[in-house]
Curated annotation (Swiss-Prot):
Pfam families: ATP-synt_B (PF00430). It comes from the Bacteria. The keyword Transport applies. This is ATP synthase subunit b 2. It comes from Cereibacter sphaeroides (strain ATCC 17025 / ATH 2.4.3). GO terms for molecular function: proton-transporting ATP synthase activity, rotational mechanism; proton-transporting ATPase activity, rotational mechanism. F(1)F(0) ATP synthase produces ATP from ADP in the presence of a proton or sodium gradient. F-type ATPases consist of two structural domains, F(1) containing the extramembraneous catalytic core and F(0) containing the membrane proton channel, linked together by a central stalk and a peripheral stalk. During catalysis, ATP synthesis in the catalytic domain of F(1) is coupled via a rotary mechanism of the central stalk subunits to proton translocation. Component of the F(0) channel, it forms part of the peripheral stalk, linking F(1) to F(0). The b'-subunit is a diverged and duplicated form of b found in plants and photosynthetic bacteria. The keyword Membrane applies. The chain crosses the membrane at residues 33-53.
Length: 180
């Protein structure tokens, strides 16, 4: 019995070796091809009914989001361009107003300066005329004083030298000398 068990075990072992890999055994190929086709059809239906619609929905949503974002960006760009244009116009208007205010202020200051200069010139002219008249008075007074001192000195010199002083001749001599 031991021999029979050994032989049966040996035959089973040799039978397994004779068969080889079941994937390469042509006896099993129709069954393997059937299950391959069933698996591929199942994967195809799973992809077409579940996965691809979800992927398509996600892609469509992304495309819509991108399109909306691009449209919003374009709209914001247009608004930014309009805002920049309005800003530049307001800035130009403000500059023009500032230049006008500067021109008005400059004109007012020039007018005030002209009035003040004219007033100062008038005051200076009046003081200058007054000073000229004073100088003329002082000069006339000094000339009169010099003439009198010269007459007195001439009379004193003539008297000191022992001569007779004639007032008319002294006046004529002093007047001739004063003229030049």
């Amino acid at each position: 019995m031991e021999t029979e068990v050994h032989e049966a075990a040996g035959a089973a072992g040799h039978a397994g070796q004779a068969v080889g890999m079941p994937q390469l055994n042509f006896d099993y190929w129709p069954n393997q091809i059937f299950w391959l086709l069933v698996t591929l059809v199942a994967i195809y239906f799973l992809l077409t009914r579940v996965a691809l619609p979800r992927i398509g929905a996600v892609l469509a949503e992304r495309r819509g989001t991108i399109t909306n974002d691009l449209a919003a960006a374009e709209e914001l760009k247009q608004k930014a361009v309009l805002a920049e244009k309005a800003y530049n116009e307001a800035l130009a208007k403000a500059r023009a107003e500032a230049q006008a205010i500067i021109a008005e202020t400059r004109a007012a200051i020039q007018a005030e300066l002209a009035v003040a200069t004219a007033k100062a010139d008038a005051e200076i002219a009046a003081k200058s005329a007054e000073s000229e008249s004073r100088i003329s008075e002082i000069r006339a007074g000094a000339l009169q004083s010099v003439t009198e001192v010269a007459k007195d000195t001439a009379e004193a010199l003539v008297a000191a030298l022992g001569g007779k002083s004639d007032a008319a001749s002294v006046d004529a001599a002093v007047a001739a000398r004063m003229k030049g």
